[in-house]
Design a protein with these regions (language model features):
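Short non-domain terminal segments
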Residues: 24-25, 35-37, 45, 55, ...
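Intrinsically disordered, low-complexity regulatory segments enriched in Ser/Thr/Pro
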Residues: 42-79
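A short, charged, amphipathic alpha-helix used as a generic interaction element across diverse proteins
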Residues: 77-88
């Protein structure tokens, strides 16, 4: 969660709406786990980012409510910020 909070802070400093969210996952009435991710959005561009146990970031990119990709894995925070900002520039430029 620490890496996702850092990411959200950086993105907000760049003028991108970003926050870390937690959604519980249940099987019946039993809590299985918490789905913790960073949601970020600017215009019609949206990213959902998870920080995996393998120390990788998993990105899902949606444009105008259409999923574009959901299996991009990046190793570092700077790669994630670069991917998000360059994608926003391409689609919202």
């Amino acid at each position: 969660m620490k890496e996702l909070k850092k990411l959200a802070l950086i993105l907000r400093a760049l003028g991108i709406t970003a926050k870390v969210e937690s959604e519980p996952i249940y099987f019946g009435s039993e809590l299985i786990s918490d789905n913790i991710f960073c949601f970020c959005k600017k215009g019609d561009v949206r990213f959902d980012i998870w920080y995996e146990e393998t120390n990788e970031f998993e990105l899902h990119f949606t444009f105008k409510d259409t999923l574009v990709y959901d299996t991009l894995y990046l190793d570092s925070l700077i790669q994630v910020v670069s991917e998000i900002t360059s994608t926003i520039s391409k689609f919202e430029g």
